[in-house]
Design a protein with these regions (language model features):
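Catalytic-loop region of hydrolases
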Residues: 1-240, 245, 298, 440
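Short, solvent-exposed loop/turn and secondary-structure capping segments
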Residues: 44-47, 93-99, 131-138, 267-268, ...
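Phosphate/oxyanion-binding active-site loops and adjacent basic polyanion-contact surfaces
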Residues: 59-63, 240-260, 289, 342-354, ...
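Gly/Ser-rich "nucleophile elbow"/oxyanion-hole loop immediately N-terminal to the catalytic nucleophile
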Residues: 246, 260-279, 284
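Primarily recognizes the serine-hydrolase "nucleophile elbow" in alpha/beta-hydrolase
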Residues: 276-322
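Extended catalytic-interface subdomain
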Residues: 320-420, 446-451, 455-456
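Long, C-terminal catalytic modules of enzymes
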Residues: 387-388, 400, 409, 414, ...
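Conserved small/polar residues in nucleotide/adenosyl-binding loops
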Residues: 554-561
Length: 565
């Protein structure tokens, strides 16, 4: 058993002791879970640098997660199901997406999950999250890297909403990825005007590893400085060799092993009663992490037991992410790299640009441990350039076969996050949209997905068939064709068709297969993209259409342009 301790920090009545129907009151158990894994066990072999991490006297590698478990006070009153909330950049998001907590200003919201008897555990897994009262942290082991030869590189993506001269060496406000040498002449800074645009180098003399302080500009291993300033609307990539090498992939082992722990008898389990089914929920970043976990086949624990019975992979698109390579930054998603690599679809196929034959479920099929999976996406993941590749051939105009264990759903006419009233044009990162944001609230569909997933995993009741843009029925269309159609219907500003994002084949060097990359990645041929077609009102026709689209009051545009970009 990989979980060796559950250090309970606090137990309290959840929601001030509110009772949730037949399931009664719930407890909230806050604590820290300690894991210890065998780096030589076959089920852990895919974790990059795990064998370079420190071990105890038994040869095991240790790491810890901050957790919070919400479960019925009387364990006999629950539904014997556990939802694992794979927190997004340290933040629990499951309650906002299933309990609609924003409408009630409380974590329990309208109580959907708890009224159905679900237990929920929120789990920290990301090495660079700075833990506090809100954020869930993770203590990862650090690998001892041979300082001779090529160690690998990382890349910091810099996008600003205003001119700034300094930027933290992290993706968002995380623990800085400090460089091994702040005077490294091989460190590189590049700039481009849009994601798929041409790239140019910024001369090394124009920037430095430094910070602007009250005493002036001073050398720093936590910041990058450029006198002319990083400009809004531009995309910068800074690559260098870091001084620290966290074993980032242990976060995925924590996600796997917390599930198997709660399905097994254990004397360190704070509720001392196994769950019958465990389902994972990830959104955006953590949805990509779920896809990466599936790809690596991480659904059997060290004793050979199945961890997850099902997953809801929400707004992840067709990518994976920076979750299992040396110097990875899990919050990074848009810079070309390991997360943009083939395969994109569940079933095995050949990469049209290489000899690689692979599928997301290949490793899981080898060990007979494929869980039930719901992929739920908004229109944004299609316009991002990658989502269609999970079900449409990447260079041929034909639909791909679906995996029998999965369902794929587009929530038509929606943006990345569920819409709310009243509409706004300022995003959580401070970016300003050209128009008010989409208000379609797709969360009822997430609730239905959970109910259907549970029935499927429990008694084999088949869920509704997949619903997404297809070539064979004309609901899938190239973005540039769609933009022209919109221009003929609506008098609005639309994206430049030449600047719509596409995923490209990437190359991180000769050791990329070991999880050790040269960055920024070299980019080559593009994989094509499709989006949903539209009707005469410019509303999407592919996927599941909410009443906002079928009982028409307005057009719900899916792409979101940012001012100044």
């Amino acid at each position: 058993m990989a979980v060796i301790n559950f250090d309970v920090k606090n137990i309290s009545l959840f929601a001030d002791g509110k009772s949730f129907g037949e399931h009664g009151q719930f407890n909230q158990i806050d604590g820290v879970v300690e894991f210890a894994v065998d780096p030589n066990n076959e089920v852990n072999k895919s974790i990059v640098d795990l064998k370079l991490a420190p071990t105890d006297e038994n040869g095991l590698v240790h790491f810890k997660s901050k957790v919070s478990l919400i479960t019925p006070s009387d364990t006999s009153k629950g539904n014997a199901r556990l939802m694992v909330d794979i927190v997004n950049r340290g933040r629990p998001l499951i309650h906002g997406n299933f309990n609609r907590m924003d409408l009630f200003d409380s974590i329990e919201g309208d109580g959907f999950l708890f009224n159905h008897g679900y237990s929920v555990i929120s789990l920290g897994w990301q090495w660079d999250v700075i833990e506090d009262d809100v954020l869930y942290g993770f203590e990862a082991p650090f690998a001892k890297i041979d300082e001779t030869g090529f160690r690998g590189e990382t890349v910091i993506e810099i996008r600003t909403n205003h001119v700034q001269k300094t930027h933290l060496l992290a993706n968002r406000i995380h623990t800085p990825n400090t460089p091994m040498d702040i005077n490294d002449p091989n460190a590189r800074l590049t700039v481009r005007d849009w994601e798929d645009g041409p790239e140019s180098n910024v001369p090394r003399s124009e920037w430095s590893f430094a910070n602007e302080t009250d005493s002036g500009v001073e050398p720093s291993d936590e910041y990058v400085y450029m006198e002319s300033g990083f400009q809004p609307g531009k995309i910068y990539y800074l690559s260098y060799t870091p001084s620290i090498a966290p074993v980032v992939g242990t976060g995925m082992l924590a996600v796997r092993d917390i599930a198997s722990f709660f399905k097994s008898d254990s004397n360190v389990n704070p509720i001392n009663k196994p769950f019958e089914k465990v389902y994972g929920f990830g959104i955006s970043q953590t949805g990509r992490m779920q896809r990466h976990i599936l790809y690596l086949g991480l659904n059997l624990d060290e004793s050979g037991k199945v961890a997850y019975d099902g997953h809801i992979v929400h707004v992840a698109g067709a990518r994976k992410g920076e979750f299992n390579h040396r110097y990875a930054q899990p919050s990074q998603q848009s810079a070309p790299g390991f997360g943009h690599m083939f395969p994109f679809a569940d079933e095995e196929m050949k990469d049209p640009y290489s000899d690689n034959v692979d599928g997301l479920f290949n490793e899981l099929r080898k060990i007979n441990a494929v869980p039930k999976v719901f992929y739920t996406n908004s229109s944004a993941e299609y316009w991002r350039g990658d989502n269609a590749n999970m079900h449409i051939h990447p260079i041929e105009e034909r639909d791909l076969p679906e995996a029998p264990e999965a369902r794929i759903y587009l929530f038509s006419g929606t943006q990345h996050g569920a819409g709310t009233l009243a509409p706004d044009d300022v995003g959580p990162d401070g970016s300003v949209g050209m128009y008010k944001f989409n208000v379609v609230d797709y969360r009822p569909l997430l609730r239905a997905s959970l109910i259907n997933l549970d029935k499927w995993a429990t008694d084999g009741t088949l869920p509704p068939p997949s619903s997404y843009p297809r070539i064979n029925d004309g609901t899938a269309i190239k973005p540039e064709v769609l933009i022209e159609k919109v221009n003929n219907i609506l008098d609005i500003n639309t994206p430049d068709p030449k600047k719509v994002w596409l995923i490209r084949r990437v190359d991180m060097g000769e050791r990329a297969s070991e999880g050790i990359g040269r960055l920024p990645a070299k980019e080559f041929e593009t994989y094509q993209n499709f989006v949903s077609n539209i009707d005469e009102d410019a509303n999407e026709t592919g996927g599941i259409r909410m009443p906002d689209l079928t009982c028409l009051l307005y057009t719900s545009p899916s792409p979101r342009d940012q001012r100044g970009s």
